[in-house]
């Protein structure tokens, strides 16, 4: 039961931390959305368990914007997308969780 209680306390602590972080996150998201609203395409880069978040991001661009987007792992991005032309029209989002060993 001690482990279960530790998990419960951890969930409460995570909720409080998120509540403190969200206002600044919202501001950052709105700022980047304003700057990137005219981008022609978006790359979502993720490796390891962050690859799923990259996939989700590219799917949301399809659904919400109807613009070109792709998900790719960092190794492939460095070999392929790194050499794209007109990079000022491609928004690149790198998903890099600090706990990801990849």
Question: Model-found features: residue ranges?
Answer:
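A SIS-like phosphosugar-recognition module
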Residues: 1-102
């Amino acid at each position: 039961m001690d482990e279960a209680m530790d998990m419960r306390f951890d969930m409460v602590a995570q909720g409080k931390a998120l509540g403190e972080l969200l206002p600044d996150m919202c501001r950052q998201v709105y700022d980047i959305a304003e700057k990137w609203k005219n981008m022609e395409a978006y790359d979502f880069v993720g490796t390891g368990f962050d690859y799923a978040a990259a996939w989700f991001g590219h799917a949301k661009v399809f659904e919400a914007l109807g613009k070109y987007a792709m998900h790719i792992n960092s190794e492939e991005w460095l070999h392929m997308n790194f050499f794209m032309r007109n990079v000022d029209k491609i928004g690149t989002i790198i998903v890099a969780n600090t706990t990801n060993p990849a």
